[in-house]
């Protein structure tokens, strides 16, 4: 049962990025933890680390985070009690901000359309590889999350920068970037050149409407055509938008951590590459088959193809009329 008292959660959440709770160091993954094979390139996502720093530095953000999780828990409980009526699919308008130095970084309109199509398939549960969801997890799959994406605009800007960091410089025109378009009402995605080992990162819903709110993705991992293997199926955007809609990494960013979702099996840490099912690890003395094919793990694009029903509920709570990202709703 993945549920923590909020005060305990906040203390854990604001701890150092690599603390991993000393009491959990005895938990075992043994030889069953999936690691990269055939490629040294691993998925790297800085969203949780950036969030921790932001929460440490801003009492206002901590308050918004507290309110966000309280509303999410209420939405989940109300849904169980039949108090939430279906209000249909939410369509989110997207602005893609392209910062390019080379022609390959100036991604084409067709590649942007391709990425939007991947998001709509993955969040609509119509992705062709959903057929690969193991029988044991079929009853837990989200299916249609009832969130769709529509390209509203593309903004392009030439730059001389050869690399970008996670300091949000790409989000300010004053630092050579592109200012966000109405971040309360649009999902802004910045596509930039090299970010080193980071494929992308995102802000969480407590940052809704702030100047830096949105998703950043390295051009090499945006879309499909021309993207770099093994992250060339558009799933970096699927993963990062999951953070934007309040999903944590499936391992809870700690050894046997908590992702605040009850139907995702607890796991010792991230999985990489293309694991073979079933993949087991042990947490709390219990051996479990892990949901490594979840979009919020670190496996290669070809190995991830599902959200869980619990994750769907968390995302729906954020875009609901009372949610932190209600401003994104299009009717």
Q: Where are the regions a protein language model picked out?
A:
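Propeptide-to-catalytic entry region of secreted or membrane-anchored zinc metalloproteases
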Residues: 27-183, 320, 325, 331
């Amino acid at each position: 049962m993945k549920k923590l008292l909020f005060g305990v959660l906040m203390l854990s959440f604001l701890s150092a990025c690599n603390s991993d709770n000393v009491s959990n160091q005895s938990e075992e993954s043994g030889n069953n933890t999936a690691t990269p094979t055939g490629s040294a390139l691993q998925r790297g996502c800085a969203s949780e680390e950036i969030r921790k720093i932001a929460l440490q530095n801003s009492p206002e953000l901590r308050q918004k985070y507290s309110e966000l999780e309280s509303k999410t828990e209420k939405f989940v409980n109300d849904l169980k009690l039949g108090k939430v009526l279906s209000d249909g699919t939410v369509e989110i308008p997207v602005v893609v901000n392209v910062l390019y130095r080379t022609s390959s970084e100036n991604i084409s309109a067709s590649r942007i359309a391709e990425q939007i199509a991947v998001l709509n398939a993955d969040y609509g549960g119509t992705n062709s590889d959903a057929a690969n969801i193991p029988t044991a997890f079929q009853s837990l799959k989200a299916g249609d999350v009832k969130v769709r994406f529509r390209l509203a605009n593309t903004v392009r800007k030439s730059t001389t920068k050869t690399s970008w960091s996670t300091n949000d410089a790409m989000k300010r025109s004053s630092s050579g970037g592109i200012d966000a378009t109405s971040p309360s009402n649009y999902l802004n995605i910045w596509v930039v050149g090299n970010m080193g080992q980071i494929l992308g990162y995102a802000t969480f819903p407590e940052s809704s409407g702030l100047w830096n709110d949105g998703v950043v993705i390295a051009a090499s991992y945006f879309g499909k055509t021309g993207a770099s293997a093994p992250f060339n199926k558009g799933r970096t955007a699927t993963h990062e938008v999951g953070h934007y809609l309040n999903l944590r990494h499936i391992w809870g960013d700690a050894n046997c951590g908590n992702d605040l979702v009850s139907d995702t099996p607890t796991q010792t840490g991230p999985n990489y590459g293309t694991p073979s099912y079933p993949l087991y690890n042990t947490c709390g003395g219990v051996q479990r088959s892990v949901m490594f094919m979840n979009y919020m793990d670190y496996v290669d694009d070809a190995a991830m193809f599902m959200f869980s029903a619990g994750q769907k509920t968390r995302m729906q709570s954020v875009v609901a009329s009372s949610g932190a990202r209600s401003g994104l709703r299009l009717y």
